[in-house]
């Protein structure tokens, strides 16, 4: 397995796992859906889970990997408001939970970088 392919498979696995958890534990995600979004939070929880699964499939397949990587980067940008919402909402929680919530915000930058790296054609 080439290094670039390994990165793509790992990113696809991360996205797929995240997508599955949106369906397995939607109650975790519902409270962090930004309140400015219209409609019920559960809709957005499931919609983001579907998006993560679709993007995972695109990243995993070599023929769609470039578009999948770009879609993954866009998805990581799109979920930034939810991570910011979680950080705000959890600001008074126990230190460990607060650290997790605060850590999700800056973690988006390396995830975006990773997705863009996967999107680049191999040399």
Give residue spans per PLM region.
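Short amphipathic, positively biased membrane-proximal segments
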Residues: 1-123
């Amino acid at each position: 397995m080439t290094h670039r392919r390994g990165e793509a498979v790992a990113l696809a696995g991360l996205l797929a796992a995240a997508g599955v958890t949106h369906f397995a534990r939607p109650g975790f995600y519902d409270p962090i859906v930004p309140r400015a979004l219209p409609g019920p939070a559960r809709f957005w929880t499931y919609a983001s889970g579907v998006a993560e699964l679709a993007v995972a499939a695109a990243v995993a397949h070599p023929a769609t990997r470039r578009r999948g990587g770009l879609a993954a980067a866009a998805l990581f940008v799109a979920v930034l408001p939810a991570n910011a919402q979680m950080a705000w909402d959890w600001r008074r929680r126990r230190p460990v939970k607060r650290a997790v919530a605060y850590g999700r915000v800056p973690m988006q930058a390396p995830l975006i970088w990773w997705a863009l790296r996967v999107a680049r054609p191999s040399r």
